Amino acid sequence: MITIKKGLALPIAGAPSQVINDGKTIKKVALLGEEYVGMRPTMHVRVGDEVKKAQVLFEDKKNPGVKFTAPAAGKVIEINRGAKRVLQSVVIEVAGEEQVTFDKFEAAQLAGLDREVIKTQLVESGLWTALRTRPFSKVPAIESATKAIFVTAMDTNPLAAQPELIITEQQEAFVAGLDILSALTEGKVYVCKSGTSLPSSSQSNVEEHVFDGPHPAGLAGTHMHFLYPVNAENVAWSINYQDVIAFGQLFLTGELYTDRVVSLAGPVVNNPRLLRTVVGASLEDLTDSELMPGEVRVISGSVLSGTQASGPHAYLGRYHQQVSVLREGRDKELFGWATPGKNKFSITKSFLGHIFKGQLFNMTTTTNGSDRAMVPIGNYERVMPLDMEPTLLLRDLCAGDTDSAQTLGALELDEEDLALCTFVCPGKYEYGQLLRECLDTIVKEG
């Protein structure tokens, strides 16, 4: 067992009951283009086209052959683009059950399948995009290979679902997915989990590793740091446990599996719980009649690292397994910094809230102040369990010093790995965004 001591278990109210319920009927689904780092689409459809489930919607010019497919059958009603014609979303109005089918196999055949057969089926179904590289968090090139695939079978994000509940429902598919991953690499498949028992693969190159501790103990970046440190030469791939289930279902049934169990939670959710929905689901549909009155912010993903779901982006992200909702913190409090703060959380214990052990806080979107200088008072070191110098790294990101940032470990990280640093930063810096700018510069400069 690898125990993480540094980090933060965010004491936020609105945790979900760990029972899976059926979500509301989803009328619209979407693929969000900006989730895929560096992707430039070649469109295969236009507004008004009827599409089948698993039909190709677009391909990636920058990553030849990688296909992005429809999560449901229906009619393309929107293709949204932003500045410089960046693809924001392709929206489908759900209708019908038509779908593209694929080859299916017996469970005993999967581990012995040829790697090219597996790759072809994953690419054609669109499930290849469930894999992400580290460094850079991109969809892997089709002809690339890796010595390490990390399965994130735990979740320490605030308000998250317990993965074992979902995996237990789909044991055969989960094991089948692990067998497929084992055949996809000549190296190892690292299944990273909490202390709970999970169904396991019998393949010799599939290893289980137990992690314990506060967030970010459940992130792929943390697992890689301790088991297979990555750099420009050592590239690892990662995948979440629900996509492993989707891999297994694809090969066992010959059909694209797009079901997704998400946590709908937060201080302003009427009944926080786990809901069964689909990849790319409209969050307007999913949260209908579920939220308390007032101005709220719906977030696809974690409150720490998720994306605001509004307008063309109001859909469940490809890599997200929770929907978090916070009240918009627009109310200003006169001399708020001088009050005792019984109902306020602070990592530096600046308020009385820390005295009441186990207290949960109705957190909002407020940053409690305006932007200011980055002040190194030890906050970053409290929440960074990786063996690196966070203050120096974050300063380099602010300054745009890519060479020094690489030396200090920037290539190991993804935006979610710095989310806690953003949360505890007294200067209100968005370190995930700065990291992405740094990584993009490194890619451009070769």
Curated annotation (Swiss-Prot):
Organism of this sequence: Vibrio campbellii (strain ATCC BAA-1116)
Name a biological process GO annotation: sodium ion transport
Instruction: Summarize the subunit comment.
Output: Composed of six subunits; NqrA, NqrB, NqrC, NqrD, NqrE and NqrF.
What gene is this protein translated from?
A: nqrA
UniProt GO MF annotations: oxidoreductase activity, acting on NAD(P)H, quinone or similar compound as acceptor
* Role according to the record: NQR complex catalyzes the reduction of ubiquinone-1 to ubiquinol by two successive reactions, coupled with the transport of Na(+) ions from the cytoplasm to the periplasm. NqrA to NqrE are probably involved in the second step, the conversion of ubisemiquinone to ubiquinol.
Lineage top rank: taxon: Bacteria
Q: Which InterPro entries has this protein been placed in?
A: NqrA, NQRA_2nd, NqrA_C_domain, NQRA_N
Key words, A-Z: Ion transport, NAD, Sodium, Sodium transport, Translocase, Transport, Ubiquinone
Entry EC no(s): 7.2.1.1
- Coiled-coil residues: none
Q: Under which main EC class is this enzyme filed?
A: translocase
One Pfam family it belongs to: NQRA_2nd
Please give the family membership noted in the entry.
Belongs to the NqrA family.
Which PANTHER family is this protein grouped with?
NA(+)-TRANSLOCATING NADH-QUINONE REDUCTASE SUBUNIT A (PTHR37839:SF1)
What is this protein's name? Answer: Na(+)-translocating NADH-quinone reductase subunit A
Q: What chemistry does it catalyse, as a reaction equation? A: a ubiquinone + n Na(+)(in) + NADH + H(+) = a ubiquinol + n Na(+)(out) + NAD(+)
